[in-house]
Curated annotation (Swiss-Prot):
The lineage of its organism: Viruses, Duplodnaviria, Heunggongvirae, Peploviricota, Herviviricetes. Belongs to the herpesviridae helicase family. One of its GO terms (biological process) is DNA replication. This is DNA replication helicase. Its EC number is 3.6.4.-. It comes from Human herpesvirus 7 (strain JI). Pfam families: Herpes_Helicase (PF02689). Associates with the primase and the primase-associated factor to form the helicase-primase complex. The keyword Cell inner membrane does not apply. It is found in: Host nucleus. SMART domains: AAA. One of its GO terms (cellular component) is host cell nucleus.
């Protein structure tokens, strides 16, 4: 008997599953509180953190590249740094995030994540303000861009590690180049006048979301910096000898941590699979016994996002490593479609294609773009991407690596994957031909080399951003019904941090002001409709009569809006030639600037315009038998805007005025077009050389899932390579920080919930792994939205689920907390 039949359909299955697990989720708080009560019986050695011997010397006395912290003459061996761990695991959609929300709401803890996407997703779920955004665990302990090129050590001296203390030192030694650099900087900063207290001094409870994608040594790194920072700043936590409790959250069966390294001497990269934190906590006997994982493990069992019984049963068999019955293998046959059908871009346009390799993704994009170019060329955008090479830094870099014959072009092609987010250039249809030219300054000197490539994207395709990107929200595109729903629910206001609510009210007021005249132009508007519209009460707003539109630009800050109203014709001038003038614009001729109004005045203006807008909507709905609400509304903030066939979006006053916001990787966006017009307060322009603008640098226009239109700031990133302790800023990349979601690798899709998926495993897949099958198929919530080119379970595949047997053992353990 199913849950839904038990309750006669009164409650849906998702609701029942969530409610049934709520009580146990609250018990996690008690579990964490108990672990966080532990304290050291005896203190750590006095000032141990000021002079620390390189731990590699304890395993290999002949080690030459010693990097001790502090004064090497007084350096002492690192003492063992104790810690506690609570492990929280479960499949996709099982409720792990709800446990983090409960911990954040009911305990004093530091919430972090392993990736920027996970961190920003948590920030949204926890409704964090801009000043309290969830950070990545790397940023939390002090990692920055200069550490990216610091390779991890590969120790060959240790064969067996018999104690947790030895294991801790060995893991710290692996990452010691980064640890020592961060610690040295912290010691120097502590001697300065201004002291910034690190986040790790806030609480002894540290939550790490998506812990399965980072290597095991990061666990000991977090423990090290907890004790290091608290000791350095003499916090109450350190004085009370409070032992940290690390809460590791993730899915060990679908995770995979990678070790990547780059050898500047050979210009070769190496990527291989590593041992992640979750796998180490579960499989490593020494670590598992020390942390008492058998007692401190919480497992979420049921996938609450997917309530299809058969599909959930199938995923559970793979998750827990249960034998696959013949009927389950036959069940997967229903998803199979011909490979030619899936690979044809004209079929299943709304589906995201998932492939096993970057090469297959890139090949699909090439076919797709060729087809779009033939059928509708205006829908294919080609955007330039620029790379500025610093000539002197490049020459110094060549000398440092003793590769004197290295040229810019081969270096560029070899290092393309390092110049920006790897998958952005590995997956996308980036032009093979590159243009290389020297940038000649006014005095005739040449200091930089410019490399130009081109990326292709499709209009109205699904995209994401590669990092948190500054944007200006300037408009709305959707149905009248959707816009009115947003106004009535105050959803946009609620999603805006409270300190910026005044700008949210002003922005929505500007959208209503810009969209008000569209009621007069609707195909459903008749003389009777206009008569009723004229009868709508238009209150007198005294401050609108006294406000002046002239405000000096010097009085603005980055969060203010700027409306260059004197450039555009006034509404009174536009209405003078209108045979059917709109009484709204005759009454309210100008909309004042945000920074000359009080919050009370802006909120009053918003309330008045909202009542007028909704009243007009109700009139049109009634006269059109509710057909008007389905029609499209496109409105921009106090601006008239037009769109060209080629996709360029133009403001009639050559500027866009919007609300400063941020696009984040956790969200989905639609590519609307691009613009060359000025966008107030997107300040990348000042950072770039004039030659970039002469070549052409558009700004990307996107639409979010609610329908709000934003213009993205251009993305500027720098590649700094570190060799022998010396840093070289070699290249600056100027692009758009966007990546297509039309197709991607299965690995990249991990952690994403995708509406509709078409899986392509290739014609004869080699090295097919069960984890890839699981990740690809579990992206969908509804199995009716999944198709595949073959049934991978009928092929030879590697069962790489080494965790499954441990999970099954834990399920039988009475001390494991199971949450269904």
């Amino acid at each position: 008997m199913s849950l839904s039949s038990l309750f006669n359909g009164k409650y849906d299955t998702k609701f029942l599953l969530n409610m049934s697990s709520a009580a146990k989720v609250e018990l996690i708080v008690e579990k964490v509180a108990a672990l966080a009560d532990a304290c050291l019986e005896t203190p750590l050695p006095t000032d141990w953190f000021r002079n620390i011997l390189d731990p590699e010397l304890e395993f290999n006395s002949n080690f030459e590249e010693i990097h001790s912290i502090g004064d090497e003459e007084f350096a002492q061996p690192l003492p063992f740094l104790p810690f506690r761990v609570l492990l929280i695991t479960g499949t996709a959609g099982a409720g792990k995030t709800s446990s983090i929300q409960t911990l954040a709401a009911n305990s004093d803890c530091l919430i972090t994540a392993t990736t920027s996407i996970a961190a920003q997703n948590l920030s949204g779920l926890l409704n964090r303000t801009k000043s309290a955004q969830v950070k990545t665990i790397f940023k939390t302990f002090g990692f920055n861009s200069s550490h990216v090129s610091m390779n991890e050590r590969i120790s060959c001296s240790v064969t067996t590690l018999d104690s947790i203390a030895d294991q801790q030192k060995h893991d710290l030694s692996t990452y010691w180049n980064v640890i020592a650099d961060i610690a040295e900087r912290a010691l120097n900063a502590a001697n300065g006048k201004t002291k910034v207290i690190p986040d790790l001094c806030e609480s002894s409870v540290i939550v790490i979301d998506e812990a399965g994608v980072i290597l095991r040594h990061i666990l000991h790194t977090v423990v090290f910096f907890y004790w290091f920072y608290n000791g350095l700043h003499k916090t109450q936590l350190y004085k009370n000898r409070v032992i940290p409790c690390i809460v590791c959250v993730g899915s060990p069966t679908q995770s995979g941590a990678l070790i990547s390294s780059f050898n500047p001497l050979t210009q070769n990269k190496d990527v291989k699979k590593g041992f992640d934190i979750l796998s180490a906590l579960i499989c490593d006997d020494i670590l598992s016994n020390y942390c008492k994982i058998s007692e401190n493990w919480v497992i979420f069992v049921n996938n609450k996002r997917c309530t299809d019984v058969e599909f959930g049963e199938f995923l559970k068999h793979i998750e827990f490593g249960l034998p696959l019955k013949p009927e389950l293998i036959e069940y997967v046959d229903r998803f199979v479609r011909p490979a030619t059908y899936i690979r044809n871009p004209t079929n299943e346009i709304g589906m995201t294609r998932l492939f096993l390799s970057h090469y297959e993704v890139k090949s699909y994009f090439k076919v797709l773009h060729e087809q779009v170019e033939l059928t509708n060329k205006d829908n294919l955008f080609t955007f330039p991407v620029y790379f500025i090479i610093q000539n002197k830094a490049f020459e110094d870099y060549k000398n440092e690596i003793s590769n004197f014959t290295l040229e810019i072009e081969p270096w560029f092609k070899t290092n393309l994957h390092r110049l920006n987010t790897y998958s952005q250039f590995a997956d996308q249809d980036l032009s093979k031909t590159i243009q290389i030219e020297e940038i000649v300054l006014d005095d005739g000197s040449v200091e930089e080399t410019l490399i130009t490539c081109h990326l292709k994207h499709i209009k109205h395709s699904s995209i994401g951003v590669t990092s948190r990107t500054k944007s200006s929200t300037v408009g709305f595109s959707g149905t009248y019904e959707k816009f009115v729903e947003l106004l009535q629910s105050d959803l946009f206001i609620e999603k805006t941090a409270c300190e910026y609510s005044v700008h949210a009210y002003s922005f929505l007021t500007g959208l209503m002001y810009g969209g008000m005249y569209s009621f007069c132009l609707s195909e459903f508007t008749t003389s009777e409709v206009m008569t009723e519209i004229r009868k709508i009460k238009l209150p007198n707003i005294d401050f609108l009569q006294t406000m002046t539109a002239e405000v000096s630009l010097q009085t603005f800050d980055e969060s203010d809006e700027y409306y260059d109203l004197h450039i555009a014709p006034t509404d009174e001038e536009m209405l003078a030639s209108d045979p059917c003038p709109d009484p709204f614009f005759l009454k309210y001729k100008q909309l004042p600037l945000t920074n000359v109004l009080t919050f009370e005045e802006i909120s009053y203006l918003y309330t008045v315009f909202k009542e007028i807008f909704i009243s007009r909507f109700a009139i049109l709905q009634r006269h059109s038998k509710e057909m008007f609400g389905k029609s499209n509304l496109i409105t921009y903030n106090r601006n008239n805007v037009s769109s060209k066939r080629c996709g360029e979006i133009c403001s009639h006053v050559k500027s866009f005025y919007g609300m400063l916001t941020y696009a984040v990787p956790a969200n989905n966006y639609t590519l609307e077009g691009y613009t060359y017009d000025n966008v107030i307060f997107l300040g990348t322009d000042k950072m770039l050389p004039p030659i970039i603008y002469k070549r052409g640098l558009p700004k990307i226009v996107i639409k979010d899932e609610m329908g709000f239109i934003s213009i993205l700031d251009n993305n500027v990133s720098k590649l700094t390579d570190t060799v022998n302790g010396n840093s070289f800023h070699i290249c600056t990349t100027i692009d758009y920080a966007i990546v297509s979601k039309v197709a991607m690798t299965v690995t990249k899709s991990q952690g994403l919930s995708i509406q509709r998926v078409a899986l392509d495993f290739g014609n004869d897949p080699k090295n097919l792994k069960l984890s890839s099958i699981y990740v690809g198929m579990s992206r969908v919530v509804d199995p009716n939205n999944l198709i595949m080119n073959l049934n991978p379970l009928r092929l030879n595949y590697e069962n790489d689920n080494i965790i499954a047997s441990h999970i099954v053992k834990a399920l039988k353990n009475k001390d494991t907390m199971l949450i269904f």
